[in-house]
Swiss-Prot record:
Keyword Translocase recorded: yes
Keyword entries, A-Z: ATP-binding, Cell membrane, Hydrogen ion transport, Ion transport, Magnesium, Membrane, Metal-binding, Nucleotide-binding, Phosphoprotein, Translocase, Transmembrane, Transmembrane helix, Transport
Biological role stated in the UniProt entry: The plasma membrane H(+) ATPase of plants and fungi generates a proton gradient that drives the active transport of nutrients by H(+)-symport. The resulting external acidification and/or internal alkinization may mediate growth responses.
Transmembrane as UniProt keyword: yes
Name of the protein: ATPase 4, plasma membrane-type
Record: residues binding Mg(2+): 596, 600
Stretches for region Interaction with 14-3-3 proteins: 958-960
Annotated GO CC locations: plasma membrane
Pfam families noted in UniProt: Cation_ATPase_N, E1-E2_ATPase, Hydrolase
InterPro entries, alphabetized: ATPase_P-typ_cation-transptr_N (IPR004014), ATPase_P-typ_cyto_dom_N (IPR023299), ATPase_P-typ_P_site (IPR018303), ATPase_P-typ_TM_dom_sf (IPR023298), ATPase_P-typ_transduc_dom_A_sf (IPR008250), HAD-like_sf (IPR036412), HAD_sf (IPR023214), P-type_ATPase_IIIA (IPR006534)
Tissue: Expressed in guard cells and roots.
Single GO molecular function: ATP hydrolysis activity
Active site: 337
């Protein structure tokens, strides 16, 4: 016994060292070398092998936490602060004064605080993400202890027997056992664009995707020993710079350039023109460097996104890519699967409506044949509905011997079972899409019209059709062609809409998100479902728009516009989904796409936000950006709202950061150059530390999500920041002038004068300027965070408490601090009250400035000017050219298109204009509803006339 165990271990160690070529030896030798059988491993044997071979996952590079911490100090914004620290001790050593150690220590402290917060939050976010992704860890169907079960793919070991089916990502390198050939997509590994066919005995690689078929396989390699694992060792991963990082860089560069311009002007004016002393000049440059850099920006934005990602996961949307949050906030088109997302995917069959085509057969026999062509295990919704109609699910296989089952695949769109009955005769039954089954039928030409009539009748009631066919197989083999196919019957399938779908679609349209239904069903079903859901019914078969046989009635119209204006697409194939997304993106839409199957992967990858719905295949999950853990459309709309709230916080902060940079650079530059006022750099450092501490709480601020799709508009951020910053800089300059050059405040409020009493004595004035700048700078966040009046939208409790504490500290410093090293002196409570009053008065116009900026940037102001000019012109010729255009215009209107001369979305830059598409979708839905009511009214009136009733009396009691 001991010898056998040792022999097994020696053989397995040889496999581990790759001394045996398990990819090429006959399959029998694979079992021999792996000391396993087709009955699978026992749990004990699997545990022993797991200890030997390790987990079935790639080794993760362990990053030094200390180096990661230092990495947060290695970015352009940090470099500027580090340069300021060096200036404080190297260049500031002159003018009879020692090096500026307090500023040096303060700058380093600020850097360490920001890096520590970033490090802790990213670490927490990383741990949370790892826990969430563990829920999405790939699963594998494995045979252990003689029973099939679903296990984490990470515990697979060589020798395990696994099952691979359509949509699965192959969990480990394996050799296929007996069964039908598989279609495997190896493009991610080998670059082969077309799926390859793999038969019994062939090897399949970990990471490839099953596109068709179902088969069992024996695992021959796991983890780093797989083909994928070896390739991953050879390829060094590269970090792609995302859009979010580009935005951060652009804002950082703007702030750095603003500071550089301010410093250059100061250097040119102070030294060659004003002949200022060396040391005060360096101090003034330090003020711009320290105060102007938004050093907390990367920390605030990453913390905001990490907290937001956690909130999304609580709502049932796990973000695989953090920056998908900003794209979700800007999404204006959502292409949603009908089945399972808009509907319940709980199919029911009405036996009374079954249409029988084969003589001698009743509805019960049609159901039994359909049940035979269904899987009893791993059922999809259709199989479950049909087998569930039987009195006992076992009846589906009662009295027959299964020879071969052909699983569903997207190409054939049908399943089939070859079986032997009690008398030893072989038969085959198939169920699937009516068109596919009809093509099999030997008498297609005779029954085609009736079949289509029944399908249309079902479709008008929102019912899908499922066809059933039957044939004898005299040869008795699974691969025999068999005799002529008999078209047995058509079954109606009803998939009821989700109870919340109609309300969710209405919410989406109100949020500026146009929902487009994507369905593989025929057009009539799509329109009927759309009607029930309160959508418009402006839908097209996707093949009529994108296929080879385009509809003649719309062939002359622009396909891109038709897609843009459509409420849905029917008869959709996977390649059509990709094309729809591509064309919507070409028209400047941020497009979301839901999907669940392996064939949805290309479209999910192409979409700006790929959303894998609940119960999606591994392939769909791996291609998506967001994975839903709850079914339905409402989860997506909730995620959109949350994403917009997260994005709003980030946008509010960036406007605030740019404004502060401009106000510090412009304000202190003017004070230094006009009045030769030298503000102490240490006090700017105190402002920065208090500001950064307060602003961290914006990540949990209470905000109203944008009512429209939102995105980074850098020109808007910079323009708003420059206007706000310039206004606040002027506030400081005016305050300085009134305090220093006039006796207005002492005369009005009875406070002491702040005029300097000795040469270079600006100590009390410095305290006053410090408090004025500190209060209004932090108060600006309340203006940038609100869409309406800042005093109406209540901020989050954390932000409010942080602001009060920070400004209490700032006020106490200004009132009491007598710091010789910082060159400030306490000004008393009287001046503190004056400064608070001054800031409150000048705070009020900030809201008006915000409204004016928004109005000016929207283009409305300039549109009005243009419209007034156009109003005085008139069109003289309404002749021939106009009449020629009328027919084309009528055709476009019929299909919901705008006039050809109207600017389309490609030319539009403002979100409110893009939102017109959602508004038009709402209008179409309303028109469809009114049309239905009008039809109903006409029907009622005709019945009333037929019955000879008094219509006037009825109309007084009821209105439509």
């Amino acid at each position: 016994m001991t010898t056998t165990v040792e022999d097994n271990r020696e053989v397995l160690e040889a496999v581990l060292k790759e001394a045996v070529d398990l990819e090429n030896v006959p399959i029998e030798e694979v079992f021999e070398n792996l000391r396993c059988s087709k009955e699978g491993l026992t749990t004990q044997a699997a545990d022993e092998r797991l200890a030997l071979f390790g987990h079935n996952k790639l080794e993760e590079k362990k990053e030094s936490k200390f180096l990661k911490f230092l990495g947060f100090m290695w970015n352009p914004l940090s470099w500027v602060m580090e340069a300021a620290a060096i200036m404080a001790i190297a260049l500031a050593n002159g003018g009879g004064k020692p090096p500026d150690w307090q500023d040096f220590v303060g700058i380093i402290t600020l850097l360490v605080i920001n890096s520590t917060i970033s490090f802790i939050e990213e670490n927490n976010a990383g741990n949370a993400a790892a826990a969430l992704m563990a829920r999405l860890a790939p699963k594998a169907k494995v045979l252990r202890d003689g029973r099939w079960g679903e296990q984490d793919a990470a515990i697979l070991v060589p020798g395990d027997i696994i099952s691979i089916k359509l949509g699965d990502i192959v969990p480990a390198d394996a050799r296929l056992l007996e069964g039908d050939p598989l279609k495997i997509d190896q493009s991610a590994l080998t670059g082969e664009s077309l799926p390859v066919t793999k038969s019994s005995g062939d090897g399949v690689y970990s990471g490839s995707t099953c596109k068709q078929g179902e088969i069992e396989a024996v695992v021959i390699a796991t983890g780093v020993h797989t083909f994928f694992g070896k390739a991953a060792h050879l390829v060094d991963t590269t970090n792609q710079i995302g859009h979010f990082q580009q935005v951060l860089t652009a804002i950082g560069n703007f702030c750095i350039c603003s500071i550089a311009v301010g410093m250059l002007i100061e250097i040119v004016v102070m030294y060659p023109i004003q002949h200022r002393a060396y040391r005060p000049g360096i101090d003034n440059l330090l003020v711009l460097l320290i105060g102007g850099i938004p050093i907390a920006m990367p920390t605030v934005l990453s913390v905001t996104m990490a907290i937001g990602s956690h909130r999304l996961s609580q709502q049932g949307a796990i973000t695989k890519r953090m920056t998908a949050i900003e794209e979700m906030a800007g999404m204006d088109v959502l292409c949603s699967d009908k089945t399972g997302t808009l509907t319940l995917n709980k199919l029911t069959v009405d036996k009374n409506l079954i249409e029988v085509f084969m003589k001698g057969v009743d509805a019960d026999t049609v159901v039994l044949m359909a049940a035979r062509a269904s899987r009893l295990e791993n059922q999809d919704a259709i199989d479950a509905a049909i087998v569930g109609m039987l009195a006992d699910p076992k009846d589906a296989r009662a009295g027959i011997q299964e020879v071969h089952f052909l699983p569903f695949n997207p190409t054939d769109k049908r399943t089939a079972l070859t079986y032997i009955d009690n008398e030893g005769n072989t038969h085959r039954v198939s169920k699937g899409a009516p068109e596919q089954i009809l093509n099999l039928a030997h008498n297609k030409s005779e029954i085609e019209r009736r079949v289509h009539a029944v399908i249309d009748k079902f479709a008008e009631r929102g019912l899908r059709s499922l066809a059933v066919a039957y044939q004898d197989v005299p040869e008795g083999r699974k691969d025999s062609a068999g005799g002529p196919w008999q078209f047995v019957g058509l079954m109606p399938l009803f998939d009821p809409p989700r109870h919340d779908s109609a309300e969710t679609i209405r919410r989406a349209l109100n949020l500026g998100v146009s929902v487009k239904m994507i369905t593989g069903d025929q057009l009539a079903i799509g329109k009927e479902t759309g009607r029930r859901l309160g959508m418009g019914t402006n839908m097209y078969p996707s093949s009529a728009l994108l296929g080879q046989n385009k509809d003649e009635s719309i062939v002359a119209l622009p396909v891109d516009e038709l897609i843009e204006k459509a409420d849905g697409f029917a008869g959709v194939f996977p390649e059509h989904k990709y094309e729809i997304v591509k064309r919507l993106q070409a028209r400047k839409h941020i497009c979301g796409m839901t999907g669940d199957g392996v064939n949805d992967a290309p479209a999910l990858k192409k979409a700006d936000i790929g959303i894998a719905v609940a119960d999606a295949t591994d392939a769909a999950r791996s291609a998506s950006d967001i994975v839903l853990t709850e079914p339905g459309l409402s989860v997506i709309i909730s995620a959109v709202l949350t994403s917009r709230a997260i994005f709003q916080r980030m946008k509010n902060y960036t406007i605030y950061a740019v404004s502060i940079t401009i106000r510090i650079v412009l304000g202190f530059m003017l004070l230094a150059l006009i009045w030769q006022f030298d503000f102490p750099p240490f006090m700017v450092l105190i402002i920065a530390i208090l500001n950064d501490g307060t602003i961290m709480t914006i990540s949990k601020d209470r905000v109203k999500p944008s009512p429209l799709p939102d995105s980074w508009k850098l020109s808007e951020i910079f323009a708003t920041g420059v206007v706000f910053g310039s206004y606040m800089a002027m506030m400081t300059v005016i305050f300085f002038w009134v305090s220093y050059k006039t006796d207005f405040f002492p005369r009005t409020f009875g406070v002491a004068t702040l005029e300097k009493t000795a040469h270079d004595d600006f100590r009390k004035l410095a305290s006053a300027i410090y408090l004025q700048v500190s209060i209004i700078s932090q108060a600006l966040i309340f203006v940038t965070r609100s869409r309406s009046w800042s005093f109406v939208e209540r901020p989050g409790i954390f932000l409010m408490i942080a602001f009060i504490l920070a400004q209490l500290v700032a006020t106490l410093i200004a009132v009491y601090a007598n710091w010789s090293f910082a060159a400030i002196e306490g000004i008393g409570w009287g001046w503190a009250g004056v400064i608070w009053l001054y800031n409150i008065i000048f705070y009020i116009p900030l809201d008006f400035i915000k409204f004016f900026i928004r109005y000016a940037l929207s283009g409305r102001a300039w549109d009005l000017v243009i419209e007034q000019r156009v109003a005085f012109t008139r069109q003289k010729d309404f002749g021939k050219e106009q009449r020629e255009l009328q027919w084309a215009h009528a055709q476009r209107t019929l299909h919901g298109l705008q006039a050809p001369d109207t600017k389309m979305f490609t030319d539009r830059t403002h979100v409110s204009e893009l939102n017109q598409m959602a508004e038009e979708a709402k209008r179409r839905a309303e028109i469809a509803r009114l049309r239905e009511l009008h039809t109903l009214k006409g029907h009622v009136e005709s019945v009333v006339r037929l019955k000879g009733l008094d219509i006037e009396t009825i109309q007084q009691a009821y209105t439509v």
